[in-house]
Amino acid sequence: MGSEAAQLLEAADFAARKHRQQRRKDPEGTPYINHPIGVARILTHEAGITDIVVLQAALLHDTVEDTDTTLDEVELHFGAQVRRLVEEVTDDKTLPKLERKRLQVEQAPHSSPGAKLVKLADKLYNLRDLNRCTPEGWSEHRVQEYFEWAAQVVKGLQGTNRQLEEALKHLFKQRGLTI
């Protein structure tokens, strides 16, 4: 498929097209694509990750869950390895929200190393965003509940990447939580 830079740009372009109508829940209505790009940036800049499969999966991690993208489509464009990682980090939206959250906690320790990296960076991005501003319609109590749930997920991802884990521990400590 060409150079790694070209592969990364293909994934970014694909994600941007798939998420083009979506916005984050922040007061500014930030374009959703900022999130997967931010997750990939955390992996490269803070965790030192250069694995192209992990970075592509980071860019694509919400496409199947939040758009009309299928896993077969991901595999067709980006290969079986990227598909497997995206599949690992994708929640089954046919399940109730509480069940999806429970499964994330339960499955975290059994995830592949690449999926663990994407999950850590995803949680770090989301928690930083929650510290920056409260999403539309969220109470401070709901924000704290999200932090508490995220701490349970992250606990199962320990031993994956020291830099990401330390950054997360710092955020949890600010909220009175330990992992």
From Swiss-Prot:
Which principal EC class is assigned to this enzyme? Answer: hydrolase
Q: Name one Pfam family in it.
A: HD_4
**At which residues is N6-acetyllysine found?**
K25, K97, K123
Q: Kindly identify the residues recorded as the active site.
A: E65, D66
List of residues binding Mn(2+): H35, H61, D62, D122
Instruction: Note the effect listed for D66A.
Output: Reduces ppGpp hydrolase activity
Q: Where is the HD domain?
A: 32-127
Q: Name the PROSITE patterns on file.
A: HD
Q: What is the effect of changing E65A?
A: Abrogates ppGpp hydrolase activity
Keyword Manganese present in the record's keywords: the answer is: yes
Give its E.C. classification number.
3.1.7.2
Catalysed reaction equations from the record = guanosine 3',5'-bis(diphosphate) + H2O = GDP + diphosphate + H(+)
The Swiss-Prot or TrEMBL record lists the needed cofactor(s) as: Mn(2+)
GO molecular function terms listed in the Swiss-Prot or TrEMBL record: guanosine-3',5'-bis(diphosphate) 3'-diphosphatase activity; metal ion binding
Does the record carry Manganese as a key word?
A: yes
Protein name (Swiss-Prot/TrEMBL): Guanosine-3',5'-bis(diphosphate) 3'-pyrophosphohydrolase MESH1
